[in-house]
């Protein structure tokens, strides 16, 4: 069985690779602003799940996995910062605070035409870090294309005090959620091992 990852995220691909899965990787090409335009006052979970589902439905494949992650902090849902300046601003806001990384998962099974959806929320305690560390981290470029402006598995690990949840969910997709989705369709995760 071939899993198609409806994402260009290197982090999501690495999570799958480390778990023995070599997915076919396809950019979903979803206009995220247009995809959520019809939502009225969505919760953070509804927002990320809607995007994850749109991505899974946009790609052809036997079994397609879509995902989307955003950071909920101080009542604000944040995606990727994209710029060094925005990264610094966000880190000034989030250092020393607790936040929630909300990740939507959508697994589309072509054989049944059904989709399994699950949102996973992971609590993150950010470290109280210096202005110098924030500036240096932003300058590396690493956090610019990451939800919440951080990574767990690389330089961003220095900025995390603790997490409450599965580490794979923080990196990009929850392996437990994927396992539950596979179970839902009657597959075993070992079917994906390449």
Curated annotation (Swiss-Prot):
Catalytic activity, as annotated: a ribonucleoside 5'-triphosphate + H2O = a ribonucleoside 5'-phosphate + diphosphate + H(+); a 2'-deoxyribonucleoside 5'-triphosphate + H2O = a 2'-deoxyribonucleoside 5'-phosphate + diphosphate + H(+)
Keyword Hydrolase: yes
GO molecular-function term, one example from the UniProt record: nucleoside triphosphate diphosphatase activity
The protein's name in its UniProt record: Nucleoside triphosphate pyrophosphatase
Any one biological process term the GO annotation gives: nucleotide metabolic process
Pfam families per UniProt: Maf
Entry EC no(s): 3.6.1.9
Superkingdom assignment: Bacteria
């Amino acid at each position: 069985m071939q899993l198609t990852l409806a994402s260009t995220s290197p982090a999501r691909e690495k999570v799958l690779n480390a778990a023995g899965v070599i997915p076919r990787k396809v950019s979903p090409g979803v206009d995220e602003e247009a995809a959520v335009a019809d939502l009225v006052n969505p919760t953070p979970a509804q927002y990320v799940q809607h995007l994850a589902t749109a991505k899974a439905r946009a790609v052809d494949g036997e079994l397609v996995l879509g995902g989307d992650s955003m950071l909920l902090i101080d009542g604000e849902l944040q995606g990727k910062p994209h710029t060094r300046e925005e990264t610094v601003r966000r880190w000034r806001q989030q250092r020393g605070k607790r936040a929630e990384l909300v990740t939507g998962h959508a697994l589309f099974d072509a054989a049944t035409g059904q989709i399994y959806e699950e949102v996973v929320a992971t609590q993150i305690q950010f470290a109280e870090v210096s202005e110098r560390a924030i500036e240096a981290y932003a300058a590396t470029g690493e956090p610019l294309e990451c939800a919440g402006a951080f990574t767990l598995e690389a330089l961003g690990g220095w900025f995390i005090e603790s997490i409450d949840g599965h580490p794979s969910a923080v990196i990009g997709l929850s392996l437990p959620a994927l396992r539950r989705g596979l179970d839902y369709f009657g597959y075993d995760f070992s079917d994906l091992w390449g």
